[in-house]
């Protein structure tokens, strides 16, 4: 059995920017050489690229951590450190990427060669050549490199198919796919012969072509996990037309109309939007005894569920085994596809908003102040923490610069308003210092 994996959880971490360098020009005949430390190189980003040759997420079963390289440190003579190469991660077509913490959709990768930056590499820290001023012509200040983005991701593969086959097990879905395409799904006279999705390309006599997916059979209660559950129904979400295959011979003792209602209930329970897709009812096994009588009863029950002004779903009697009625079914499917647009997979609320909106709004706080049980003041906030990690705490001038930045952000004043006294401990991350009033 071929291994098929359509979900995965991974972590990605972009590379850190290289540290800037503190250096001075010391050459004969060059008095007052001045600062000469270069900037660090940028960290590598993590980029997802679509590869049409991949069919599953199997590559992510054991390799779950992806980390790009960091940029090189700045060098003397004002030379920049080398930037790190981006890490390219190949994914199959139809991969949806979500943020594991928020559940938001980051991107939907459907085209071969499509690339998306999933985690951006940090910028390189500036060398001391960048901090020279008339007041301080020989600064001993350099920045650390910026940390790269780190994310926990959920990958979900939904195969790209125009048409999806649904129905109870052993109604003939795999046989139908095998006779209308070059696909070779496993076929057997027992339930759940198909345990992974199969995909085949179908070409009609008129020259139209489309992709058809055969999904593992559903049974009543699948939405509650009975049988194989609905774990593979995600693959039908990209389809535009559903072929609902029914065993009209009732060879297993079930009523064909009850089968039809049960499967539609499972589709609706899984995702209401699946019922928006047009359905064609495929009355299979019409070469079997009692199939004609069952089809008449099926049509009568179906008509009773619709108003006289409603359009009934199209019904095509076929026999996959005897190759009967297939041409009409495929031509009708192609015509329905031609006039059916793609369906929206996600609500706007599910998507990560990457657009920028400009207008008057209250500025977000640059920092937050809390107090631990041990009476230590704790500073946090994205901007403040970013400034902190880019500060070289081994150099006094860099520390003094960071203190000025905190003062400029209003941290000192905010601490006083909260009741901080001279000598109180203040913590940023794991770094502690005394508050000086």
Swiss-Prot record:
The Obg domain, residue ranges: 2-160
GO biological process, one term: ribosome biogenesis
Domain OBG-type G: 161-338
Pfam families assigned to the protein according to its UniProt record, in alphabetical order: DUF1967, GTP1_OBG, MMR_HSR1
Binding sites annotated in the UniProt record for Mg(2+): 174, 194
One GO location term (cellular component): cytoplasm
Intracellular or extracellular location(s): Cytoplasm
Gene3D superfamilies: GTP-binding protein OBG, C-terminal domain (3.30.300.350), GTP1/OBG domain (2.70.210.12), P-loop containing nucleotide triphosphate hydrolases (3.40.50.300)
HAMAP family: GTPase_Obg
Function, as annotated: An essential GTPase which binds GTP, GDP and possibly (p)ppGpp with moderate affinity, with high nucleotide exchange rates and a fairly low GTP hydrolysis rate. Plays a role in control of the cell cycle, stress response, ribosome biogenesis and in those bacteria that undergo differentiation, in morphogenesis control.
Self-association and partners: Monomer.
UniProt protein name: GTPase Obg
Gene, per the UniProt record: obg
